[in-house]
């Protein structure tokens, strides 16, 4: 049994991932102690909010035919990969995101969890991009990947900064 994906589904998933990322950053912000890390989480939380709105707008602008399947996956390999990624690494719900943030032992651990989430989000969207037809929204998926890449850079800098302060 195969599965097909549409550009519309990519944007729906993007919106869900951004919403869950916002929940993670909101909880991490509430638990953060240092002003610098609080600023990072606050900024990322706001960016997730903006990305959600951006992706919602992009989804609404998709031509009607992008809600139709754009690629067949007869062996369900891509589906199985994406399903495994979501179940093992990405937050399935906002509640799971908040629980992970609450479980972090310190700010650096919370930042590292955020970094893992953002990297996995990029992998997820790169796979979705690979199976979405160019004429039906692939370039729009690239926008999602670019936004998430900026998150990785921001979090990586924050980790380096926080670790530098902790080693002094």
Residue ranges with predicted function:
Residues 1-168:
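Non-heme di-metal
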């Amino acid at each position: 049994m195969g599965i097909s994906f549409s550009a519309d589904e990519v944007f729906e998933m993007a919106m869900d991932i951004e919403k869950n990322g916002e929940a993670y950053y909101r909880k991490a912000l509430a638990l953060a102690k240092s002003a610098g890390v609080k600023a990072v989480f606050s900024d990322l939380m706001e960016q997730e909010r903006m990305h959600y709105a951006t992706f919602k707008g992009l989804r609404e602008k998709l031509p009607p035919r992008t809600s139709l399947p754009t690629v067949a996956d007869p062996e369900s390999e891509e589906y199985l990969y994406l399903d495994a990624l979501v179940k093992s690494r990405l937050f399935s719900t906002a509640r799971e995101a908040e629980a992970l943030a609450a479980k972090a032992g310190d700010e650096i651990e919370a930042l590292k969890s955020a970094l893992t989430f953002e990297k996995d989000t990029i992998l997820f969207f790169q796979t979705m991009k690979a199976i979405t037809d160019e004429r039906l929204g692939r370039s729009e998926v690239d926008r999602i990947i670019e936004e998430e890449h900026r998150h990785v850079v921001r979090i990586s800098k924050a980790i380096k900064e926080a670790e530098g302060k902790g080693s002094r």
